[in-house]
């Protein structure tokens, strides 16, 4: 691969690289630093994050302390709600308070909810995702507004299609227009492919137009390569040209 831009090194804090060091948690805990507790009350399962003192605590990277999931007679989740550490409804990412799920033979309708469990429009411009399943894998998503009409999301597309390899790993993402055809999104490309190593970890991505030709993204590169540290986090990104 040709290097389009200089290598961009993501600065990591010294504490992140020293797992044995004391960490200042004034800003809060991430989910990976917390224990998980679960209670079941009839059809509702409540999963909470718990700090080292045994106190239910909000995980700052996912935006809630407890998620309550209601299941139907087939053990499928039909609704979930997010709560803060005090047990009050909380907006995940400041955007929505819960999700509802409706199922048919080939697809699932996922609707975003407000604090009163009513459908709400996300900041991305849609209220519901209709997701087609192929086997157990999510294949196509299309977006709908509060009136059930197809809507273009803020990224400039009406839907997306996921491609998989024989191992079931997601290898591509194609942005779709209203009719399900590939379309160039505001990111500058229509198709993004993922490169994975022998362990299945994503180590790079490349961008293509609707015809499958390499294309420059809106940020100027044709793709990226990643190097990861021992913890699995990306600590170096190399930007690529068309070759």
Task: Tell me the role of every PLM-derived stretch.
Residues 2-15:
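Hydrophobic membrane-insertion alpha-helices, especially the h-region
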Residues 14-22:
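Hydrophobic single-pass membrane-insertion segments
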Residues 22-243:
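Buried hydrophobic residues that stabilize the cores of well-folded domains
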